[in-house]
Amino acid sequence: MPRNYTTQEKIDQEFGFLVKDKDNHEHYGKILQQDRENIHTQVGVVLPGSYELSRIELVEGNFAIVLLDHSSERIAYYVKASVWKDVVLNASPVTQVLLWRTNDVRHEMVTTGLARSIFFKYLLESYNVVASDSHQTAEGREFWTRQTGFALATDLYVYRYHRIDCTLIKITDHAIIRDNSCDLWGDNEDYCNVLAIISKEAITI
């Protein structure tokens, strides 16, 4: 899977507008001015009355899934996703390029389990193939380790895909993902080209 993303300054830049309370509140206000598609039914979650789970379209074909709390006027959960065409896979995978959840315990009951529901019930159902990002934090790596395990347990397809070599290796044993003996993660630049793939259907190249 991707190159390990360990530079704290870069991580702070990615998540800064969500982590800082003032910036979070300001971004919440900006989202209210945008067109939003409520997706809580597709995701299969029941939300308390003050919460809204919506999709908003971004530039260059990207989109975001946001959990808004209208009581506190804050963003409680944010996923930025990108859809890209891959001619080798003959598919258009969706990739979560940013995933953030508030650590404010007031939202914990609502956000717990939301990541998996969005991943499998919305992203995978909508696009059939979900691919990892090219860089990941330690938390992102842990997230993908869990999701691949869930995918294998529910008879979905998991692969290691190298975008330059055009190699696709099917993975059936979650243990080799947990200990990384399948070589999904690493520190050198080439790991930017290594992706984990979860698919609803078998992929052949």
How does the language model describe each region?
Residues 1-110, 121-205:
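Non-catalytic substrate-recognition and accessory regions of acyl/acetyltransferase enzymes
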Residues 115-116:
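Contiguous hydrophobic, core-forming segments of folded domains
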